[in-house]
Regions:
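Phosphate-binding/catalytic loops
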Residues: 74, 80-143
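Short secondary-structure boundary segments
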Residues: 8, 79-80
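Conserved active-site segments centered on acidic
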Residues: 1-72, 141-143
């Protein structure tokens, strides 16, 4: 929601996986629904990315703008509440908004959210990374 943990991790994982398969035609960025005014990425999230071979440095939170939403071919969110907020704020984008976990092989609508690990245990950060990582495999098949 603030673009310092989940969306940041998803952006970096997606960019890394697309680079490995030489998909240079896809532009990936992340933004939050709360203005954190350039706050750096959560250091635990950045460390987990680095540990798995993804770029974890040089990220600062940015707020999603109307221009970003209107230009995006796909808008991927982490929780259903985010999807609902986005549809309310950007109704023209409704058909382009999806839950990241809906691309997962094991998707179950009842458990479609990727929970925010911010300020929780390392276990929660690792679980979040795993859910994002596996969901992105499915997302790439749809791009």
């Amino acid at each position: 929601m603030a673009n310092i943990v989940r969306s940041f991790m998803a952006e970096r994982i997606l960019k890394g996986k697309l680079e490995k398969i030489n998909r240079k035609d896809v532009d990936v960025s992340s933004a939050g629904l709360i203005d954190m005014d350039g706050m750096p990425a959560d250091p635990i999230a950045a460390g987990i990315l680095n540990d798995h071979g993804f770029e974890g440095s040089n990220h600062h939170a940015q707020l999603l703008t109307e221009d970003m939403a209107s230009r995006a071919d796909m808008i991927i969110v982490m929780e259903d509440i985010h999807r609902k907020m986005m549809i309310e704020q950007y109704p023209d984008a409704a058909g382009r908004i999806s839950l990241l976990k809906s691309f997962s092989r094991d998707y179950n609508e009842a458990y479609g959210d990727i929970r925010d690990p911010y300020k929780l245990s390392m276990y929660h950060y690792r679980l979040c990374f795993s859910e994002i990582y596996l969901s992105i495999d499915g997302l790439i098949k749809c791009i």
